Amino acid sequence: MSEVQALVECPVIVGAAGHVDHGKSALIEALTGKNPDRLEVERRRGMTVELGFGELALPSGKIVGLVDVPGHAHYLRAMVQGATGIDVAVLVVSAVEGVMPQTREHVHVLELLGVTHMVVALTMCDLADAEMTELAELDVDDFLSGTVFAGAPIVPVSSKTGEGIDGLLAVLDEQVSACWDACRDRVERSDAAPRLPIDRCFTIKGAGTVVTGTLHDAPVAVGDELMALPSRTVCRVRGIQVHGDTPRALPGQRVALNLVGDGVAALDRGEMLGVADRFGQTLRFMMTFTYLGREGAKPRVLESGARVHVMAGTAEVVGRIMFMEGEAPMAVGETRIVQVRLENSLPLRAGDHAVVLSYSPVMLIGGGRVLLSRCRRSRELAEGERALYVAIESGDIAGAVDAWLALQALPVTAVDIAEALDLGTGEVDAALRGLVAQGSVRKLTVGDADLLADAVVLDAAMYALAATLSAMHAAAPKETGFTPGAVAHAAWPAADEGVAAALIAEGCSRGVCASEGAEVFDPHSAAAAARVVREACERIVSLLDEAGLDAPTLPEVGEQLQLDRDTMTRALRELSLNRAIVKVERDVALSATAEAHARELVAAAIEAAGGAATTSMLREALGVSRKRAISILEHLDAVRFTVLDKEAGGLRSLR
């Protein structure tokens, strides 16, 4: 690289992997000039047992993060943790030994973690003749042909003599450039939140607690408030280093964060930093799982319920692999959708990759990609769920949103969708615009909020509303309507107040229901009930008009008209509200016409008597029994039409 070449920090991680003693650390020292073995035991043994991190300057001027992972079988866990976040793998294979057990294991891990770019460094070429080197190349090429790394460039090198190092750097530069556009897309996801799986935590005198890891999803900046899971430790970023001090780090970069906050010194590898309420942990998740069997062991099937170690990010949790109902044991090489049930919570989101190790002895047996980070505890897989997982696996965001909505019984918010599928709100909004436009998703509005529902699901909710109202009207045929709460509880027991209001409003717009005041009703059933009451009102008024002032008691009216008690009660309430009848006793009412006639008779009698009349005179004018006359006269007193003067001998006069 030219001395005047401008250096550009590139959010790409290059990771060196391979069998123990194949020269990874020596190669990294040849590439960078630094020994990645940071522990005394590593330098003494001559092999990497912990993760080594550094930086690498490429010929184009790009500076990338560099990870050296352990090659020995005993340090498989450290290898998996180090491989998390690698974008470009450098597979180190000795030209003397060729492909070895940990070579295979490391390639499998890289595949399971979603790595797609690889360069093979064929090391120790100074110790092998041309024929041996060629055979080693053929061995590597043949092995990789059955993986996603088929056709990966193979570069013979010697860390001791420097042969091939420049060529390896040039090929690495090309591979890093191939990742560059994807990295830019990753950085530009403005609605994502950062996550940092912690792989180291240590204290620096004068600075305090420092954690390191590979940053995922979104940038992090000095001053950001973060939380660690599963400990729920809250902290603030006081300083950031990425190949030096910087105010902001990008996803895909190796970062060191200087943290302040209670409990930060107790943080350790396996925890994940993120923004509170923007990431979570789970005890159950769905994943696409590939079963590899145990390297070097006799092939055997994997049974449902097998206890395993699950590794994701830098965390490791014991759990069980559960197959779907009726599925047979898995054969080596098979891939299927499984549910993973964990014994402790694991910070995870859809799209993450997980590696699965056998419980004992601890060996790599498989892994894959997380489809849903939270799921119900069931081994039954509905057809709609299969469609959801197919869409998620293929990266079809609109298809995943559509399929997930089809599984929901009630309308939801865009935030609900984003949280369930671990998507950014911008991604969800873009998908919803297309789905709403094509009619497969309907938008409902309640207050200032929008709710979304699959069109078929919404039709089913409207059918439930119609059936509910029909049943409620049938059970109470005289009721003209019901409270929204009662209707919603019967039609959609799980709906909250906002969702219920939106569904009832949708029902009103479709003519499924109607609402008036505080009541919701079936416009047809309610009309029938109202008609029964209205007809009863007309018959009651007609009878009372005909009876005049000598009206029968209300129970007698109901008996004469053969009205049931409920209809009679509702009709009398309606008539009283409309002032079509006037009660003069507890169980006696006059029609409005009869009561007006009584006023005329009483007024005429009082005027004829010179302005005041006795009860006897007024009873005679009314032409009814003394008891009924007293009831009518007391009613007229109560409504302030007349006034009784007890001191004047019980005379009544007009007010």
Label each residue range with its predicted role:
Residues 2-69:
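Conserved G1/Walker A P-loop phosphate-binding module
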Residues 6, 125, 142-295:
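Conserved catalytic-core segments of large NTP-driven translation/proteostasis enzymes
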Residues 21, 27, 46, 66-68, ...:
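Residue-level signature of catalytic and energy-coupling elements of molecular machines
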Residues 69-74, 84-106, 111, 115-135:
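Conserved Switch II/interswitch segment of TRAFAC-class P-loop GTPases
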Residues 72-73, 96-100, 115, 124-129, ...:
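Conserved nucleotide-binding/hydrolysis micro-motifs of P-loop NTPases
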Residues 94-95, 118-134, 155-163, 260, ...:
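G-domain G4 guanine-recognition motif of GTPases
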Residues 128-133, 142, 243-244, 262-583, ...:
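C-terminal effector modules of nucleic-acid-centric enzymes and ribosome-associated factors
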